[in-house]
Amino acid sequence: MARKCEICGKGPQFGNRVSHSNRKTRHKFNPNIQSVRIEINGVSRKVKICTSCLRSLKKSV
C-alpha cells in the first residue's frame, strides 16, 4: 500500500497527457501522500495520509 491514504483510501488515478498535436499518452496521477505521526486512541502511530486529510486533521485540532 505505497500510494494510498490510510484515512480516506485515496489512491492513484489514471488519465492522459495531451500534447499540442493532441497526441494522448497514459499518465498516472499519484495523491500527495505524507508520512505523519498521529496520536490515535492515546497511542502515537506513524501513518501515511494525503494532504487533504492532513489539512482536515489540523483544522479539527
UniProtKB/Swiss-Prot annotation:
InterPro entries: Bacterial_rp_bL28, Ribosomal_bL28, Ribosomal_bL28/bL31-like_sf, Ribosomal_bL28_bact-type, Ribosomal_bL28_sf. Keywords: Ribonucleoprotein, Ribosomal protein. It comes from the Bacteria. Disulfide bonds: none annotated. This is Large ribosomal subunit protein bL28. NCBIfam families: L28 (TIGR00009). One of its GO terms (biological process) is translation. One of its GO terms (cellular component) is ribonucleoprotein complex. GO terms for molecular function: structural constituent of ribosome. Belongs to the bacterial ribosomal protein bL28 family. Gene3D superfamilies: 2.20.150.30, Ribosomal protein L28/L24 (2.30.170.40). It comes from Nautilia profundicola (strain ATCC BAA-1463 / DSM 18972 / AmH).
